[in-house]
A protein has these predicted regions:
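A short, active-site helix/loop in glycosyltransferases that binds the activated sugar's phosphate group
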Residues: 1-25, 62-63
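Short alpha-helical donor nucleotide-sugar binding micro-motif in glycosyltransferases
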Residues: 93-98
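A short hydrophobic beta-strand element within the catalytic core of glycosyltransferases
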Residues: 101-102
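Catalytic binding pocket for nucleotide-activated donors in carbohydrate/polymer assembly enzymes
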Residues: 110-184
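C-terminal alpha-helical cap of glycosyltransferases
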Residues: 167, 183-201
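Aromatic "clamp/platform" in nucleotide-sugar-dependent glycosyltransferases that forms part
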Residues: 106
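Short beta-strand->alpha-helix junction loop in the catalytic core
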Residues: 9, 26-39, 132
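Conserved catalytic-core segment of nucleotide-activated headgroup transferases in glycan assembly
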Residues: 31-91
């Protein structure tokens, strides 16, 4: 038997939680989140509004307040999506029509919402959280489990976010988050990975 897991779940289970699992039995690759045709259709969205999409999941409310106050100071419009309080179609609609996003979440194993945003080719600033509290355990983690420099900017503190924001916004044209999705996260890529594992079992 083999188990398919994300890289961070593999690290947590095998090396940090002490589970008696043979690492050779675990295959690490992500689930697909979109088909290639739909992904390519997202490239047509060019005339985006000067607006920031904020995604907020299980973080201190003070973190959100700091970010919204910063955007207000810079006269940047924003739309907030709170985890569990939105329809997915509305998140996608906003992502396809916003210039950039700020993503704040607890650590994720794969992070489907983040990847759906990236599939809309919206550059993100991710305020990362690297510690995952699970029951009585303290595990390593990250807010963004799959990432590349094409996707945007990863920061560890609000101070860093504040310092980097202007330069990030001025250089949005340099980012192509959709490249990461094409390479790793389409349904077609997932099918190819599964087929390979079955053929080399």
């Amino acid at each position: 038997k083999k188990v398919v897991a994300s890289k961070i779940a593999f690290k947590n289970a095998v090396y940090e939680m002490g589970h008696n699992i043979d690492p050779k039995r675990i295959v690490t690759f992500p689930s697909g989140i979109i088909d290639e045709d739909t992904l390519n259709s997202h490239l047509k969205y060019k005339n985006r509004k000067d607006k920031c999409l904020i995604y907020f999941k299980k973080r201190p409310s003070g973190d959100l307040e700091k970010v919204t106050n910063l955007l207000k100071d810079k006269n940047i419009d924003y739309e907030i999506f709170h985890y569990g309080q939105y329809a997915n179609k509305d998140l996608i609609r906003s992502a396809l029509n916003s210039k950039f996003g700020i993503f704040m979440s607890r650590p994720e194993t794969q992070g489907f919402a983040a990847q759906e945003l990236l599939s809309c080719n919206i550059p993100l600033i991710v305020w990362d959280q690297k510690t995952n509290y699970y029951e009585d355990l303290i595990l390593s983690g990250t807010t963004m489990s799959y990432w590349s420099n094409d996707c945007g900017l990863m920061v560890d503190t609000f101070e860093e976010l504040k310092f980097q924001l202007d330069v990030f916004v001025e250089n949005l044209h340099k980012f192509q988050p959709i490249n990461l999705i094409k390479e790793h996260l389409t349904y077609e890529k997932f099918k190819k990975n599964l087929k390979y594992e079955f053929e080399h079992f």
